């Protein structure tokens, strides 16, 4: 009974180790963290670079009007999605 528990534990530990090694080598190849950060900032830059006279989702709407499809929250003064319970 002890041998079976030990062998199951070693098998599980080996699979976890294999997963970690494969993930690490794949991450190095793809440079996952850099790609993720650059994609996040690229989306943010699109909003900054584009000439807009409206505010997008979760942007302040005190001075700007919200873009189409959004409404200005009277409580928080952010552009949010319209919902039946919001007025």
Curated annotation (Swiss-Prot):
The keyword tRNA-binding does not apply. InterPro entries: Huwentoxin-1, Huwentoxin_CS1. Residues 25-52 form a propeptide. Keywords: Disulfide bond, Ion channel impairing toxin, Knottin, Secreted, Signal, Toxin. The keyword Kinase does not apply. Disulfide bonds join 54-67, 61-72, 66-79. Residues 1-24 form the signal peptide. SUPFAM superfamilies: omega toxin-like (SSF57059). It holds the Pfam family Toxin_12. Expressed by the venom gland. GO terms for molecular function: ion channel inhibitor activity; toxin activity. GO terms for cellular component: extracellular region. It is found in: Secreted. Its main location: secreted. The presence of a 'disulfide through disulfide knot' structurally defines this protein as a knottin. Ion channel inhibitor. Belongs to the neurotoxin 10 (Hwtx-1) family. 51 (Hntx-8) subfamily. Hntx-8 sub-subfamily. This is U3-theraphotoxin-Hhn1a 16. The lineage of its organism: Eukaryota, Metazoa, Ecdysozoa, Arthropoda, Chelicerata.
């Amino acid at each position: 009974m002890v041998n079976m528990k030990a062998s199951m534990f070693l098998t599980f530990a080996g699979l976890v180790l294999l997963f970690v090694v494969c993930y690490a080598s794949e991450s190095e190849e793809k440079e996952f963290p850099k790609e993720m950060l650059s994609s996040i900032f690229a989306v943010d830059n699109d909003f900054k670079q584009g000439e807009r006279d409206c505010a997008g989702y979760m942007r302040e709407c005190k001075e700007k009007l919200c873009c189409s499809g959004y409404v200005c929250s009277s409580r928080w003064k952010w552009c949010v999605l319209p919902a039946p319970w919001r007025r």
